[in-house]
């Protein structure tokens, strides 16, 4: 019983350790994420963005975000851990060092008289005759008496000096950190221990791993359902027009899970009538088109109507239930659009090329959803008003009036501050405050520059079948001097970081693609340094040359550039006029493209190498043949010489015989 009691005190320590192993790193990760979110506060300062409220949290929102299930669980576990720490700190230790001077309340090296005096004083307090308390009796016998004996009895003192205890060498015990009620079970503790071991160490991890694998098997790395990716891959076509991208985008499995309520039928009818002009219906077959529209899946209908409400900036009229569905649709939109463009540019043909036209349509849809600009404004017309509509205080009439004056959004940006202010005040009668808001947004809009090359590393030209290296430096500049920033998007209810997609394309074929982000400077520096090092070392560059190239790349990254590099197989012989696009998924009107001429030569390197190898093989064959002939020629010559000698001997013998005769 005593042994089980001593071992059971280890159980709180065991529980404390098992809780601390996952809880401490998880808490650290949550705190680091919260800190990084606070650091990423570089967003637009215009009145519309401030009025949207997504960058400012009310007290109720802060409380609700803090009182989430995961946060409350973490706080509760920390409270339990603090209690266990306090409990283990105050409970008696399983084994303590025997300190006789400390037990008697003396300093080490005290005299015999001081030892006896202290013993008498403690005997009055703890002796069984003076104090009937069992705990006092136990303390007196096990501690005070042994301490006095260790300091006064010669044998006990010798044992204490040798072994640290007056009774001599002490053994040690090993216990199991389990609660006392399990250890007290007669003959049943083994089964309980076996069940606990199997359950906690084998079954529980297997169950957790099975649940994780079952859930992760349904999603991609971007938290998009595999069912959605498969649908996107099958529905995309190479000649897909931008106006048809919406029909594929809303087929996501995430949107099929939106609840369909009978109470929303009337509201959806009103939504349909309000956005009817934006639904791309054929006016010649309007009734048939409407009937075809309502035959779609109810969740698909609701999704498309809610997205159209976002594009027309009329989401404020939605009912509370539709508002929840509206937020659900927009929350999934960025990751679904990213997966959709990946399915557009993923290699499909034998040459490993994707499709450019669907990718451009996906980027247009993404820009319109984030900036809440109708797709009809992107259609070709005499005035390109779509970029103007992303500015604060701009509507369609104001955008058309300004577009007539400056012809293009780029020229509007190139105007001086005074000229632009005068134009906005006199032509469309905007106030000074409105003009200041517009200037704040114009200072946030990035301008891009592309510098792209395509070559075969270590060779003078590109030959068919080579592994080409595509290297592009994307440089971003803003009038306000920022590099990474949260874009102006007052009508998009969630935080949205700006991303850029680099596409290298020939006609409708995408040769190469990569996503670029400007928020993470440290990650970009590390990626550029590793890429430069891995590229130069195989070419035999010296350490100094590699370090200089890395240093130059780091300076470029810090000044607002990002390195994009990839490798692809060179096509057949010919001249290819490629176009490198840099597309924003957030801003309208800042996309850039540049031309790149790639000349692929006929394959000659391997042929020359093969000819050289054949020449070497022929020379080797000739040498071997000469060696072969020389061996046998020597034998034949030896035979001839032998026969000649034999003939000479015979002739000489004949001559000698004739002489004798």
UniProtKB/Swiss-Prot annotation:
Gene3D superfamilies, alphabetized: 5' to 3' exonuclease, C-terminal subdomain, C2 domain, DnaJ domain, Sec63 N-terminal domain-like domain
Locations listed in the record: Endoplasmic reticulum membrane
Cytoplasmic-side segments: 30-65, 212-661
CDD domains registered for this protein in UniProt: DnaJ
Annotated SMART domains: DnaJ, Sec63
GO (cellular component) term, any one: cytosol
Induction of synthesis: By tunicamycin.
J domain segment(s): 99-164
Highest taxon above the source species: Eukaryota
Compositional bias segments (type: Acidic residues): 609-637
InterPro entries: C2_domain_sf, DnaJ_domain, Ig_E-set, J_dom_sf, Sec63-dom
Coiled-coil regions listed: none
Keyword terms of this UniProt record: Chaperone, Endoplasmic reticulum, Glycoprotein, Membrane, Protein transport, Transmembrane, Transmembrane helix, Transport
Main location: endoplasmic reticulum
TM ranges: 9-29, 66-86, 191-211
Expression tissues: Expressed in leaves, flower buds and flowers.
Any Gene Ontology biological process: protein transport
Topology within the bilayer: Multi-pass membrane protein
Record: glycosylation sites: 90
Recorded phenotype for the gene knockout or disruption: No visible phenotype under normal growth conditions.
Keyword Zinc applies: no
Region (Disordered): 608-661
PROSITE patterns the record matches: DNAJ_2 (PS50076)
Function description: Required for integral membrane and secreted preprotein translocation across the endoplasmic reticulum membrane.
Name under which the protein is recorded: DnaJ protein ERDJ2B
Origin species: Arabidopsis thaliana (Mouse-ear cress)
Taxonomic classification: Eukaryota, Viridiplantae, Streptophyta, Embryophyta, Tracheophyta
């Amino acid at each position: 019983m005593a042994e089980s009691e001593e071992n059971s005190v280890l159980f709180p320590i065991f529980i404390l350790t098992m809780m601390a192993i996952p809880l401490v790193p998880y808490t650290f990760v949550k705190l680091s994420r919260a800190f990084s979110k606070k650091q990423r506060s570089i967003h637009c300062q215009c009145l519309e963005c401030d009025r949207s409220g997504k960058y400012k949290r009310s007290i109720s929102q802060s409380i609700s975000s803090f009182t989430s299930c995961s946060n409350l669980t973490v706080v509760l576990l920390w409270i339990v851990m603090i209690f266990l720490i306090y409990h283990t700190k105050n409970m008696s230790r399983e084994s303590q060092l025997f300190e006789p001077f400390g037990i008697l309340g003396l300093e080490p090296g005290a005299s015999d008289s001081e030892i006896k005096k202290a013993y008498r004083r403690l005997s009055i307090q703890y002796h069984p005759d003076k104090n009937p308390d069992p705990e006092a009796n136990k303390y007196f016998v096990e501690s005070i008496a042994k301490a006095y004996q260790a300091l006064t009895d010669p044998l006990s003192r010798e044992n204490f000096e040798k072994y640290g205890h007056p009774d001599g060498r002490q053994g040690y015990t090993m216990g199991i950190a389990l609660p006392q009620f399990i250890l007290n079970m007669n003959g049943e503790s083994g089964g309980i221990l076996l069940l606990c071991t199997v359950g906690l160490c084998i079954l529980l991890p297997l169950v957790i791993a099975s649940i994780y694998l079952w859930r992760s098997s349904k999603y991609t790395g971007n938290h998009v359902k595999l069912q959605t990716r498969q649908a996107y891959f099958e529905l995309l076509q190479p000649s897909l027009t931008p106006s048809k991208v919406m029909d594929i985008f809303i087929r996501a499995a995430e949107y099929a899970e939106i609840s369909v309520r009978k109470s929303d039928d009337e509201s959806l009818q009103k939504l349909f009538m309000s956005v009817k002009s934006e639904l791309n219906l054929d006016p010649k077959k309007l009734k048939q088109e409407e009937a075809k529209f309502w035959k779609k899946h109810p969740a698909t209908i609701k999704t498309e109507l809610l997205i159209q409400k976002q594009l027309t900036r009329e989401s404020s009229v939605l009912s509370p239930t539709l508002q929840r569905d509206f937020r659900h649709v927009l929350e999934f939109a960025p990751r679904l659009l990213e997966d959709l463009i990946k399915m557009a540019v993923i290699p499909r043909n034998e040459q490993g090329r994707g499709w450019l036209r669907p990718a451009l349509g996906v980027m247009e849809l993404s820009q319109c959803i984030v900036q809440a600009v109708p797709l009809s404004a992107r259609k070709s017309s005499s005035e390109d008003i779509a970029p103007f509509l992303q500015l604060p205080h701009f509507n369609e009439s104001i955008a058309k009036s300004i577009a007539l004056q400056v012809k293009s959004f780029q020229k509007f940006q190139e105007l001086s501050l005074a000229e632009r202010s005068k134009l906005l005040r006199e032509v469309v009668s905007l106030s000074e405050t409105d003009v200041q808001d517009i200037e704040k947004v114009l200072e946030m809009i990035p301008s891009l520059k592309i510098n792209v090359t395509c070559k075969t590393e270590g060779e003078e030209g590109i030959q068919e079948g080579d592994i080409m290296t595509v290297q592009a430096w994307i440089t971003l500049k803003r009038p306000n001097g920022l590099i990474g920033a949260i874009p102006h998007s007052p009508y998009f209810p969630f935080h949205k970081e700006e991303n850029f997609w680099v596409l290298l394309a020939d006609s409708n074929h995408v040769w190469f693609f990569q996503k670029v982000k400007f928020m993470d400077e440290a990650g970009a520096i590390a990626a550029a340094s590793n890429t430069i090092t891995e590229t130069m070392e195989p070419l035999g560059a010296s350490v100094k040359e590699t370090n200089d190239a890395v240093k130059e790349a780091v300076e470029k990254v810090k000044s607002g550039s990002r390195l994009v590099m990839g490798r692809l197989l060179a096509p057949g012989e010919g001249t290819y006029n490629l176009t490198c696009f840099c597309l924003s998924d957030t801003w309208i009107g800042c996309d850039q493209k540049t031309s790149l001429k790639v000349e692929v030569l006929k394959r000659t390197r391997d042929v020359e190498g093969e000819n050289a190898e054949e020449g070497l093989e022929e020379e080797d064959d000739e040498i071997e043949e000469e060696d072969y002939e020389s061996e046998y020629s020597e034998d034949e010559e030896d035979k001839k010489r032998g026969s000649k000698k034999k003939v000479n001997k015979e002739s000489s013998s004949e001559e000698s015989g004739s002489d004798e005769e």
